[in-house]
Regions:
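Mixed-charge, Lys/Arg-enriched low-complexity segments
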Residues: 109-133
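Short aromatic-glycine-(Arg/Gly/Cys) micro-motifs in beta-strand/loop hairpins
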Residues: 4-14
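Charge-rich, solvent-exposed alpha-helical interaction surfaces
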Residues: 30-33, 51, 62, 118-125
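Acidic, low-complexity, intrinsically disordered interaction modules
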Residues: 38-113
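A short, compositionally biased
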Residues: 1-6, 81-85
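A short, charged, amphipathic alpha-helix used as a generic interaction element across diverse proteins
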Residues: 27-41
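A short, exposed loop/beta-hairpin motif centered on an aromatic-Gly-Thr core
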Residues: 15-25, 108
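Alpha-helix boundary/N-cap detector
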Residues: 21-28, 102, 113-117
Length: 133
């Protein structure tokens, strides 16, 4: 089956927006792109969804269909809640799909650090981040 990449929701400013990107094959890619594509120096940082290459906005109904059914073509599902300082990640890291929750600011710090393995860095700091799976 073709990998469709990841589906993600960005909550902030009282709204939610939904996206997919075939170039994001997992949370590690998502984190890396947050830093790599933040924008040009001296300008305001790009919005999160514009940092993700080939991000395509989808409707809430499409998001719900993908996320609720855990569409097997997608390698991960990510929800970024900026106001609540949360990043929810549902990804198969080797033992089936599992749900994780990290502080948004910690994810951004790891992105800025250029950590080779964001999972390792975040799980070392937040060992209870795994919520299920």
């Amino acid at each position: 089956m073709k990998n469709k990449g990841c589906a993600f929701e960005i909550q902030g400013g009282g709204t939610s927006r939904y996206f997919t990107s075939p170039l994001v094959h997992g949370f590690a890619d998502f984190v890396r792109f947050l830093d790599e594509n933040q924008g040009e120096a001296g300008h305001a940082p790009l919005p999160l969804h514009k940092r993700i290459p080939q991000a395509t906005q989808i409707s809430e109904a499409e998001w719900r269909n993908i996320a609720d059914n855990q569409d097997t073509g997608y390698s991960c599902f990510i929800v970024v809640n900026i106001a609540e300082n949360q990043v929810w990640v549902n990804e198969d890291t080797g033992a089936g799909m599992a749900l994780y929750c990290f502080p948004f600011l910690a994810v951004m710090e790891v992105a800025a650090s250029g950590a080779a393995d964001p999972w390792e860095t975040l799980l070392a700091k937040y060992p209870s981040a795994k919520m299920s799976g």
